[in-house]
């Protein structure tokens, strides 16, 4: 078994597409506005966006609540050349970061964290 891609189920499809395309600069390889589906192919790892409503219909969960957020359930990690520069670029684009770049000695890495429009946690990461 091999992981193919990660599908994020989003509340505001248009806003999420703009965030991943414009703020993060990920290239879109497939976009279906009517179905509210987008595929970003960033090399080895692909990220899909699909509206939560559409996915709920597909799996028969349309009557279940979309509310009830808790602590983060997962994290998307992006390897970058320079955490501080990437942080500054994101900040200039209006991305609200959770923390400033800092070293995690136990990971031998420099990291910073922010969230997408659906509050999914994202980490930028560089080995020390």
From Swiss-Prot:
<dbReference type="InterPro" id="IPR029068">
    <property type="entry name" value="Glyas_Bleomycin-R_OHBP_Dase"/>
</dbReference>
<keyword id="KW-0456">Lyase</keyword>
<dbReference type="InterPro" id="IPR004360">
    <property type="entry name" value="Glyas_Fos-R_dOase_dom"/>
</dbReference>
<dbReference type="InterPro" id="IPR037523">
    <property type="entry name" value="VOC"/>
</dbReference>
<comment type="similarity">
    <text>Belongs to the glyoxalase I family.</text>
</comment>
<dbReference type="InterPro" id="IPR051785">
    <property type="entry name" value="MMCE/EMCE_epimerase"/>
</dbReference>
<keyword id="KW-0533">Nickel</keyword>
<dbReference type="GO" id="GO:0046872">
    <property type="term" value="F:metal ion binding"/>
</dbReference>
<feature type="domain" description="VOC">
    <location>
        <begin position="2"/>
        <end position="127"/>
    </location>
</feature>
<feature type="binding site">
    <location>
        <position position="48"/>
    </location>
    <ligand>
        <name>Ni(2+)</name>
    </ligand>
</feature>
<dbReference type="Pfam" id="PF00903">
    <property type="entry name" value="Glyoxalase"/>
</dbReference>
<dbReference type="InterPro" id="IPR018146">
    <property type="entry name" value="Glyoxalase_1_CS"/>
</dbReference>
<protein>
    <recommendedName>
        <fullName>Uncharacterized protein YraH</fullName>
    </recommendedName>
</protein>
<feature type="binding site">
    <location>
        <position position="123"/>
    </location>
    <ligand>
        <name>Ni(2+)</name>
    </ligand>
</feature>
<dbReference type="GO" id="GO:0004462">
    <property type="term" value="F:lactoylglutathione lyase activity"/>
</dbReference>
<keyword id="KW-0479">Metal-binding</keyword>
